[in-house]
Amino acid sequence: MKKYFLILMACLMFLFAACNKTASSENKAESNYPPMVKVNGTIYVDTGYENAMVTCGTADGQIKTTVDGRKMPSKDDESNFGKGYGYQIWEKGYINVQIDNRWILFRDLDLKDESREIPEWVAHFTGKVIKAESDSLMVEATQIDDRFYFKEIMTKPISLSIENLDNSKDGKVTTEDLEGKTVEVYFGGEIKNIEPENSDPIFLENIYRIIVK
């Protein structure tokens, strides 16, 4: 009797695990759509990048309705990630949506997806690597576009994490031989430790990509 009971329990555990796996797969499949919004008949999709060239905080409109995240918005001023967010019409094919007090770039869904190309309005600068550690880089900014608000404050060394460094060896990200090299740094979020009297290096909140030139 005990033997049959153990067999029955094993079968039930197998079925439970199989059901959980199926449910997990279904939930994953249902969460396919990234954040999207429909404005003036066009659906825009979140690029994941912050627009650092916004100089006016006035919104052109507001997201008024929302649908489930598993759906695409079907009418104007509707999103699949919430309502109440302001938006600005930007350059052709792009709008900005104000999320957590930051203007996030959304791209026309019908535009060719250049997944490796970062929009020109995202904060970036050219720099020289002055020190390379195994998990970080120290750089000094050598060239910054005049249109960026932070040009006048990047006067100290800048510390960079390397999670998004485009430099690998044997399939692993590495900082080997990078001292003295030129890099292009794309970032977003807060710029910390900018005070001249602060001896700590400048710290960038979000590093989108570091490209070695």
Regions picked out by a protein language model, each given a short descriptive name:
Residues 15-18:
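C-terminal motif of bacterial Sec signal peptides marking the signal peptidase cleavage site
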Residues 1-4:
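Positively charged n-region of N-terminal signal peptides that target proteins for export
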Residues 20-22:
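Bacterial signal peptide processing site
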Residues 10-13:
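Short, low-complexity S/T/E/D/G/P-rich linear segments that nucleate or cap local secondary structure
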Residues 29-91, 134-184:
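Mature extracytoplasmic domains of secretory-pathway proteins
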